[in-house]
Amino acid sequence: MMSRAFKHPPRSVVRLGAFIALIVAHPGLWAQNQPSFLAQSALPQDDGYAHLGVASCASSVCHGAMLERTSTTVLQNEYVTWTRHDHHADAYNTLLTDASKRMATNLGLPNAHEADLCLDCHADNVPTAMRGPEFDITDGVGCEACHGGSESWAALHTVATVTDDELRQAGLYPAHDPVEATALCLSCHLGNEDKLATHKIMGAGHPRLSFELVTFLELLPPHWERDDEYLARKRAPDLLGQWIQGQLTTAKSSLRLLRTHLVDSNTTLPELAMFDCHACHHAMSDQRWQPSKLTVGVEPGTPRLNLAYFAFVEPLAQSLQTSGSADIVPALRALNQSAHVSPEQLSDILNEVSDLIDETISAAHHINERIDGTALLHRIAEESALGTYRDYSLAEQAAMAMNLLLEREALWEQSRPAMRAVFASLMNEEQYQPDSFASAVKVLLEVLPEDAGRTKEL
């Protein structure tokens, strides 16, 4: 749950500052790395290659060195970083806790640590026939869960002349690519057509899920170094480029989930995991209902779709000046309303929203200069202060976006107290108050430099 993560807001000032300096030195990286916004690779769990196991990577001359090495293109202590600091290494062990045992009982499962329903995201749960001699399911979310089965690329990836394309063809998942990384992370941190943390699973005790690519990568203990060599080899975009690709890829994935679970499911009761949790789950005495820019036309007491993965396409489209940017908010309102009318009407609106997202993707594809990050920061902050992002999941996404934009625009240090107050307003989602979040963002706006495009009076 992001409320836990917000206790330590993701800033990593030294590392991010160095990364931003490198991007300034390589301004063409975003334009060169033309993203497809559509993942092209099979996910590691379904890649068809044998997974040889974490132990096959852990030699001290491979990725198990105790200290970072500077004479090679990789640090070579990746295994140590993962096993000591990365929560993915404990993902399987989470299934052994009392809370997981209780969830398994509630779901009618004998044991969480033996159920595919749980192992699919808490381990590298490939078929038994695809497990190598050193494979151990208890390793949790290990190397090959993200980098793909190493059956064919293990021997290749140490060859100096091997290309990224050759490694990719051998099954190495391109986790450095923001679009591919988003698809991979979303497969567990949101869900896809094959696996989903359903309302039933959350009702059994599983925490609410959320995701934003840049923030989650910054919270991940890095087992890589974003230096000149990395940027040249990976052609990585900067923080804003990552955020753009993550947002648009997530939006498209979310559309597919809505279609799968609300249009094509043929069930009487819709999959409630597609809706905003806090629209229903709050104390009856908490009189928080108030229409906002995104909920016009939705009546009090009506379950609302979780728009957190769509809403920020709108300020992005405004920044890109797409022809349909003014149509995005009305389309999102219609999306919310159509969910209570008929699957047919919902399907039509999903098509409309998809077209608007595709237009934004096309604009992002062909942008030849940097988006004004400060103007985008102001736009998101102003909408937050006005109450557009009142719902917790929306406020959460807005906070993560503002935080990374402050980093990208070298404004984080001067705004640190104000940004920390924004995070503090989100610390406990059960006690969250929309007005407190909006007030905190108003204070943040006061310490930001004036933006020439600012038009809203708060």
Q: Which residue stretches match the model-derived regions?
A:
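N-terminal secretory signal peptides that target proteins for export/translocation
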Residues: 1-12
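N-terminal signal peptide c-region/cleavage motif recognized by signal peptidases
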Residues: 25-26
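Primarily the internal scaffold of c-type cytochrome electron-transfer domains
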Residues: 33-45, 66-105, 133-141, 149-396
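Short cysteine-rich clusters marking metal-coordination/redox-active sites
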Residues: 57-59, 118, 143, 185, ...
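Anionic, Ser/Thr-rich low-complexity intrinsically disordered regions
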Residues: 60, 65-66
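Post-signal peptide N-terminal segment of secreted/secretory-pathway proteins
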Residues: 105-144, 411
